[in-house]
Amino acid sequence: MTVKIAQKKVLPVIGRAAALCGSCYPCSCM
């Protein structure tokens, strides 16, 4: 497994988190 494959799986999750948290996942969720 490479980092790029892991990123492809994680990015959609981050996108959903951003939508749920008001499009500001670094400041709202983390």
UniProtKB/Swiss-Prot annotation:
Induction entry: By low copper concentrations.
GO process annotations (BP): copper ion transport
UniProt superkingdom: Bacteria
Cross-link (Proline 5-hydroxy-oxazole-4-carbothionic acid (Pro-Cys)): 26-27
Crosslink site: 2-(3-methylbutanoyl)-5-hydroxyoxazole-4-carbothionic acid (Leu-Cys): 20-21
Catalytic activity: 2 superoxide + 2 H(+) = H2O2 + O2
Enzyme Commission designation: 1.11.1.-, 1.15.1.1
Keywords: Copper, Copper transport, Cytoplasm, Disulfide bond, Ion transport, Metal-binding, Oxidoreductase, Peroxidase, Secreted, Transport
Prosegment location in residue numbers: 1-19
NCBIfam families with a match to the protein in the record: methanobac_OB3b (TIGR04071)
The name this protein goes by in its record: Methanobactin mb-OB3b
Organism: Methylosinus trichosporium
